Amino acid sequence: MTPATARDATERDATDTDVVIVGAGPVGLTLANILGLQGVRTMIVEERATLIDYPRGVGLDDEALRTFQAIGLVDKVLPHTVPNQILRFFDGNRRLLAEMAPPDARFGWPKRNGFVQPMVDAELHAGLARFPHVEVRWGHRMAECEETADGVTVRLDGDPTPVRARYLVGCDGGRSATRRLMGVSFDGTTSPTRWLVVDIANDPLGHPNSEVGADPARPYASISIAHGIRRFEFMIHADETDEQAEDPAFIHRMLGLLVPHPERVEVIRHRVYTHHSRIAGAFRKGRMFLAGDAAHLMPVWQGQGYNSGIRDAANLGWKLAAVVDGRAGDALLDTYDVERRKHARAMIDLSTMVGRVISPTNRRVAAVRDKLIRGASVVPTLKRYVLEMRFKPMPRYEQGAVFHPEAPSPTSPAGTLFIQPRVDTRDAQNVLLDEVLGTGFAVLCWNNNPRALLGADLFDRWKALGARFVAARPLTQLHWTGHDDPDVTVIGDRTGALKGWFDAHAESVLFLRPDRCIAGACIAQRAPEVSTALFGVLHLTQGGGNGHHGADRPVLHVAQSATEPSGTVAGTP
């Protein structure tokens, strides 16, 4: 047998799957859970033998927790978090400069949460056991990937049997092999400043919050994680080598700046790192995609590297599932880059800017900075702007898988994330809205029946796509049965948050994507025309696909953690 015929025979024996994910980090694991829930055959390829067992990311935001809720794992994640974590900034004399303590939880979860990444990653991995059609291959490195007209063929080191898939997603980190195979640039900068990070067990300070010391002598950070773990970070001066910084005596000297007995601490791990501000030239090329650190890197100062990767998975996951399942055309996948690039760029820029504010080592520059920050804090609106983290860029899609009837307006809700208050149904009380909406598309109307607004044909078309239909009412009307419809769930506005939202917007009908972005919004009379337009911009098919998404799929019940303090979730009574 010639090499060519041997290769052909091997190709015939190839393993078939729908999506190959390269990398079993948090982004790849989250994406695999999203695809698994939608019945998509998925294979994760990871060159390591097991999960990374040391902390990397230390902060989860409300959007990430909402995604973990969507995949049915938030109750597994919450025990490894510190909710409502306050972040304080101090000057070189340990006087308070600013504080971040956002009070609201409009998306259903606290905005700032410390967490232990290895334990959360382990829960994401364990969640895959629910899906017989999802496989993880540990200790396998992707050697090459060949794209064909209808898919990709992946070859793994040490495995003669190739893997055929329709799509491949590189979630393989900043040194992404997928990105290199795609021939995509990774433009940006790497800071010349180095930092020493030290993770400590049995927290020597013990308080629940975090702080950043904008000390020109040596900027530092002290971050409470969970389970008694604390992270310290110290800037390394230009005249200090990496070898010096990793010496135990140097580490003890740094820790001695913040703890009384540095020799007694239990070091989990320490390393020297630099900050990168980079973004890939393309997030999609043919049938290959990039997500997480493979697509973008940002400084740590806003804790958004991990969370940005989870946003990638949430954005791309439902689109891949819809295309693989036949509910949408391949063009829907082009909207991933269109939507995620601008927001990732904004997060990179914000994180880079905050790092520049924190890091000056010139005392005069630091003194001017301190005066400006203190002056701004005297103004109530500016103080709230920082305290409530209003500076954080929120996704607002002007293009992509969204419909704007005219030029996007700053006040239009289309392209933004919808809130997640607590609501009542006829059968349950005090449930988070997403539990009612399910895991697919949803049509939500205030005080109207979606079927009456859409008409029979459009209603049935959304139903064939697995959409759920929800009529929101004031709580006083919850048990009125005059307009009942077996396909429409009636919810009572338990907290008034829904009425408040609709009061602030002209639109009363919302078409929600599976990632809870508002794909389209309109007044009641325009529901049919906006619905029709959405089938076009979402590239949805007429037939409703292959049926994996079934409308009767049970909604995953996510109970509120018993340890969650009152007031951390929007609408908690």
Curated annotation (Swiss-Prot):
**Can you tell me which residues bind FAD?**
18-47, 283-293
What are its GO biological-process terms? 3-(3-hydroxy)phenylpropionate catabolic process; 3-phenylpropionate catabolic process
Q: Which Pfam families match?
A: FAD_binding_3 (PF01494)
Q: Which domain of life is it from?
A: Bacteria
**Annotated EC:** 1.14.13.127
**Reactions accelerated catalytically:** 3-(3-hydroxyphenyl)propanoate + NADH + O2 + H(+) = 3-(2,3-dihydroxyphenyl)propanoate + NAD(+) + H2O; (2E)-3-(3-hydroxyphenyl)prop-2-enoate + NADH + O2 + H(+) = (2E)-3-(2,3-dihydroxyphenyl)prop-2-enoate + NAD(+) + H2O
Which GO molecular function terms does the record list?
3-(3-hydroxyphenyl)propionate hydroxylase activity; FAD binding
- Report the cofactors: FAD
Which keywords does the record carry? Aromatic hydrocarbons catabolism, FAD, Flavoprotein, NAD, Oxidoreductase
Q: In which pathway does it act?
A: Aromatic compound metabolism; 3-phenylpropanoate degradation
User: What family is reported?
Assistant: Belongs to the PheA/TfdB FAD monooxygenase family.
Q: What does this protein do?
A: Catalyzes the insertion of one atom of molecular oxygen into position 2 of the phenyl ring of 3-(3-hydroxyphenyl)propionate (3-HPP) and hydroxycinnamic acid (3HCI).
NCBIfam families attached to this UniProt entry: PRK06183.1-2, PRK06183.1-3, PRK06183.1-5
Name of the protein described by the UniProt record: 3-(3-hydroxy-phenyl)propionate/3-hydroxycinnamic acid hydroxylase
What is the originating organism of this protein?
Answer: Mycobacterium sp. (strain KMS)
